[in-house]
């Protein structure tokens, strides 16, 4: 059992919505661990735009063809969930120094609750440093073109949720002049 535990990581979040920053981190986590569970949180102090089922379904669509990556909803304490799933690693992403303080506190609390569950931090790829689910929702709600910042299925769902038609008004599109090195969206 202990040999298997280090090969499985849990990457938790609300994923409301899933962004390309999340996708990048999950893929990179999969390069380190044999399996990564994308654990979609049911219990959140935030009021999600998408239901738990919608968030799980969108993530499942994104990772459908990715071996070793599964998506599951979870509720309750993250460390309890990780333990139930046989994982002793929680994978977390850091965008900036401002993320570190909060993530550090969470990691220490999780360690206090379950000493054998470790938190592993990965730095976000530089091209995703500025995005968050909150910023994505704010831009999308005002008609901003967030294409390429979220997977295509999430992009479509955001457009539907906010009632914006296709195709987008080119005047609302984000500039992509400096984004030539960004990978295409899924």
From Swiss-Prot:
The lineage of its organism: Bacteria, Pseudomonadati, Thermodesulfobacteriota, Desulfovibrionia, Desulfovibrionales. It comes from Nitratidesulfovibrio vulgaris (strain ATCC 29579 / DSM 644 / CCUG 34227 / NCIMB 8303 / VKM B-1760 / Hildenborough). Its EC number is 2.7.7.3. Homohexamer. GO terms for molecular function: ATP binding; pantetheine-phosphate adenylyltransferase activity. Belongs to the bacterial CoaD family. The keyword Transferase applies. The record marks 22 as: Transition state stabilizer. This is Phosphopantetheine adenylyltransferase. GO terms for cellular component: cytoplasm. It catalyses: (R)-4'-phosphopantetheine + ATP + H(+) = 3'-dephospho-CoA + diphosphate. Its cofactor is Mg(2+). Reversibly transfers an adenylyl group from ATP to 4'-phosphopantetheine, yielding dephospho-CoA (dPCoA) and pyrophosphate. It is an enzyme of class 2 (transferase). Keywords: ATP-binding, Coenzyme A biosynthesis, Cytoplasm, Magnesium, Nucleotide-binding, Nucleotidyltransferase, Transferase.
